[in-house]
Amino acid sequence: TDYTYERHVAWMNEWLNKNDFTGMTFVGQDWGGLIGLRLVTANVDRFDRIVVANTGLPLANREPSAAFRAWQKFSQEVPVFDVGKMMSGGSKTELAPEVIAAYNAPFPDETYKSAARIFPTLYPDGVDHPSNIANTKAWEVLHAWNKPLLTAFTDGDPITQGGHKTFQLEVPGAKGQAHTLISG
């Protein structure tokens, strides 16, 4: 299939290079971090700083949270993939009906939800996953990253909870930054 983590990285990298952007600040949240950090580390001269928020860059030797594993399972087994209801359930406060409707708007029926439903299974884990080598190389670049890296995480996300510590401890550019940990 063409719908893989690696293809998403390649598509975004192609877009980045065609647009020839430089001097950028990368802001990555959720899957934006998994895909975008690969872009940053493959194009270090284009980026001046990084902000990561409730995201990570998976490695085979770092097991994802139990909450993420539950999300993967749920995404494949729930009969009706109600995006708006899921977004409301993942929020600290219940979302208004019109906000839930807005989240559901791109998905008139289940046939439109194939990509959203399959995305959790694209997570690159295990030593045999094709992305393991590329993600390991990306972490090697991050371990040498001296430009600013800021974390802006929430302590209430069971999937990424504590992920800010990895970036703060392992990326030199994270030292001395005004990191944010949002309650809730």
Predicted segments with their positions:
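Helix-rich cap/lid subdomain of alpha/beta-hydrolase
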Residues: 59-119, 123, 127-131
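Short beta-strand segments
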Residues: 25-29, 51-54, 118-120, 150-155, ...
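Active-site loop/oxyanion-hole signature of alpha/beta-hydrolase fold enzymes
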Residues: 1-28
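Generic structural signal for small/hydrophobic residues in well-ordered secondary structure
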Residues: 12, 16, 29-30, 103, ...
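Serine-hydrolase catalytic core
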Residues: 113, 137-146
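Conserved loop-alpha-helix segment in the C-terminal half of the alpha/beta-hydrolase fold
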Residues: 146-184
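Conserved hydrolase catalytic core segment
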Residues: 19-63
